[in-house]
Amino acid sequence: MPGNTFGHSFRITTWGESHGRALGVVIDGVPAGLPLDTEIVQKELDRRRPGQSAVSTPRSETDKVEIISGIFEGKTTGTPISMMVWNKDADSSSYDNIKDLPRPGHADYPYMEKYGIRDHRGGGRSSARETIGRVAAGAVAKEILSIFGIDIIAHVTELGGIRAKEMPFDTIKEHLEKTPVRCADLEAAQLMLEKVGKAREEHESIGGVVEIIAIGLPPGIGEPVFDKLDADIAKAIMSIGAVKGVEIGIGNEAAQMKGSQMNDPFILEDGKIIAQTNNAGGILGGLSTGMPIICRASVKPTPSISKVQHTVNTKEMKNSDIIIKGRHDPTIPPRMVPVAEAMMALVLVDHMIRSGHIHPNSLLKQ
């Protein structure tokens, strides 16, 4: 199975399945000299782990990370970093009776068609638990970026049709973890919570929108044509399970605008060239402008719902019905927040290295 590696100069390979013994990641291209320990990585993993609130699956996993290689005396050595998390609370019993019934909205059917075999326990490799490796690697990327004044935050801006008000970066950062839905607009967050509760009562699920913002990126980061910064960001975010659409800046609204409305005029402020507006989302021609990078991801409702759905029994080759039991998230966006931040961080650190802003071998040579 190819396609498990992401990045160019800063590369990650994730491995493991939802109900396997463990999951993890190998990171290649981390410069030497970065102070790093398990506490830094664990902090990010704790943000994505299940069983923390009513808006997530009740599966109880501690997701304690072990750093296997690449660290000596508290600093990275420049060699590959390997990290792993043991699965402690995998319960496969609810999947055994549906192993021949492809779940609507899941990757079961195309996996079977492509490989002729699949791990039916919790979705195997296509499970959201695959993102453990992404978040662990993203924690490392975030640490590197912080040295250069780059900060990333993601938050839920829409859930079940409830939209949050726009807020400044600092307010989002302050309010983000005050509510289980990770929405900085606390009034909207309460309505979102009610929507989640209603969906759970109705054996349903709801989708939403996650916005990712990165500030502090210098202008000129990215590669033109096929390795454009926005193209790589879109690929990174689109690779997260359940994401069905990605927008950069004003996004789809650009199609209804005039050029005079869409263009971001440049002005000189304190000796620096900045844009008066940021419809472009901080990227022009595939290169950063120095303005905040803004990206939004449209996330579908959790496909695992406890309602009768039509499917096909692939063993008997006849139409059938399926009711999905087990422990599932009623909504995905709140738990996707740290995953989205991680993927943005991975793209940005990769391009910072490629552009020469970060030394590829050692931070001690900056």
UniProtKB/Swiss-Prot annotation:
GO terms for molecular function: chorismate synthase activity; FMN binding. Pfam families: Chorismate_synt. Pathway: Metabolic intermediate biosynthesis; chorismate biosynthesis; chorismate from D-erythrose 4-phosphate and phosphoenolpyruvate: step 7/7. InterPro entries: Chorismate_synth, Chorismate_synth_AroC_sf, Chorismate_synthase_CS. FMN binds at R125, S126, S127, G285, K300, P301, T302, P303, S304, R327. NADP(+) binds at R48. CDD domains: Chorismate_synthase. GO terms for cellular component: cytosol. It catalyses: 5-O-(1-carboxyvinyl)-3-phosphoshikimate = chorismate + phosphate. Keywords: Amino-acid biosynthesis, Aromatic amino acid biosynthesis, FAD, Flavoprotein, FMN, Lyase, NADP. It is an enzyme of class 4 (lyase). Reduced FMN (FMNH(2)). It comes from the Archaea. Gene3D superfamilies: Chorismate synthase AroC (3.60.150.10). Its EC number is 4.2.3.5. Signal peptide: none annotated. Its cofactor is FMNH2. GO terms for biological process: amino acid biosynthetic process; aromatic amino acid family biosynthetic process; chorismate biosynthetic process. Belongs to the chorismate synthase family. HAMAP family: Chorismate_synth. This reaction introduces a second double bond into the aromatic ring system. This is Chorismate synthase. It comes from Methanococcoides burtonii (strain DSM 6242 / NBRC 107633 / OCM 468 / ACE-M). The lineage of its organism: Archaea, Methanobacteriati, Methanobacteriota, Stenosarchaea group, Methanomicrobia.
